[in-house]
Amino acid sequence: RFIIDRWSEEDIKGFLHLAYKKEVEERRSEIIEDEPTMTKIAKAATWLTGDYKPGLLLYGGVGNGKTTLAKAICKTIGILYDSAYSNERKGVCRISALEVAKCASDPESFTRLRNQEMLFIDDIGTEPASIKSWGNEISPVTELLYSRYDRQLFTIITSNLNDKELEERY
C-alpha cells in the first residue's frame, strides 16, 4: 500500500494544509481554519504516513470539505511524487462516480480504472445504482471498489450519503 515515508507526519500535515488552502482559494473563498477542518487535515496526514488500509472514505453533508480535502491529498501526492522532490512518478487519477458508471460500458476504460495505482472517486451515490452493459445488469462503482479493495489499491472516495445509505447501496 502507498505510504508517504520520506516526510514526517507533521510535514505532510503542513503540505496538506497549504494544498487545502489553495483549493479553497481557487474557488474564490476563504479557508475557515477551525478545529474540525484542521482535525480532518491532521487525520489525512496520519493516514498518508501510517500503515493503514489503502482506502479513505470521506463522507458527510454537502459543503463540509470532503472533495476539497481529497483534492488537497491528490495535489500533495502530485507535488511530492511528480516533481524534482522524487525520482518516483506518482499521481492520483480523479474521476466522478457518474463518469465511472459511463466508463463501465467500455471494458478497456473500466479495466484501466481498476488498475490505476491511485484513484480518487468523487461523489459516490450520485451515479445510477446499476446499469445495463452488454445485456447484463452491473453496478460499476461497487464492482470497481471491490476489485480495488481485493488488490489493496490506494483509493479515495467522497460521498454525501450517510452511514445507513452507504451500507444499503454498497
Predicted regions and their residues:
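Short loop/turn elements that form and flank the Walker-type P-loop nucleotide-binding site
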Residues: 51-52, 88, 113-115, 148-152
